Amino acid sequence: MTHDNKLQVEAIKCGTVIDHIPAQIGFKLLTLFKLTATDQRITIGLNLPSNELGRKDLIKIENTFLTEQQANQLAMYAPKATVNRIDNYEVVRKLTLSLPDHIDGVLTCPNGNCISRSEPVRSSFSVKSRGGEVHLKCRYCEKEFEHQVVLQAD
């Protein structure tokens, strides 16, 4: 009897696979983007070996498909991630992520005086890329922040 020491994440018949997520980011994506707000099966792989990243996370959601806009919002956290649409166990579409112009209802403004932190409004940021740096400008307080500052506020 041979023993295979390699564990594999089960293939899905139909749905979305988010691959090449940096390690330790998978759970954050599940929470921020409310990916668990479904009764469909979700498979999560954490700290999986990756030639490109060293370690990576992976999320598979059955019978659920992300729009291009939803997929691009993931780029703030996982710029090199790929979002694959699966049908009948085959990849039928691969989305390469790009930064969106706006991110709404996902991030929290780090400005403690911003109205979005105390009033029932959806957060909204415009995304600006200058010289390889990504900045986010809050729609409400109009302050601009380096993207890492906003990502850490969540």
From Swiss-Prot:
Pfam families reported for this sequence: PyrI, PyrI_C
NCBIfam families, sorted: ATCase_reg
Signal peptide: none
Name listed for the protein in its UniProt record: Aspartate carbamoyltransferase regulatory chain
Gene Ontology biological process terms in this record: 'de novo' pyrimidine nucleobase biosynthetic process; pyrimidine nucleotide biosynthetic process
Organism of provenance: Serratia marcescens
Chain sites annotated for binding Zn(2+): 109, 114, 138, 141
InterPro entries cross-referenced by the UniProt entry: Asp_carbamoyltransf_reg_N (IPR020545), Asp_carbamoylTrfase_reg (IPR002801), Asp_carbamoyltrfase_reg_C (IPR020542), Asp_carbatrfase_reg_C_sf (IPR036792), Asp_carbatrfase_reg_N_sf (IPR036793)
Physiological role: Involved in allosteric regulation of aspartate carbamoyltransferase.
Cellular component annotations (GO), alphabetically ordered: aspartate carbamoyltransferase complex
Subunit-level organization: Heterododecamer (2C3:3R2) of six catalytic PyrB chains organized as two trimers (C3), and six regulatory PyrI chains organized as three dimers (R2).
Keywords on record: Metal-binding, Pyrimidine biosynthesis, Zinc
GO MF annotations in UniProt: metal ion binding
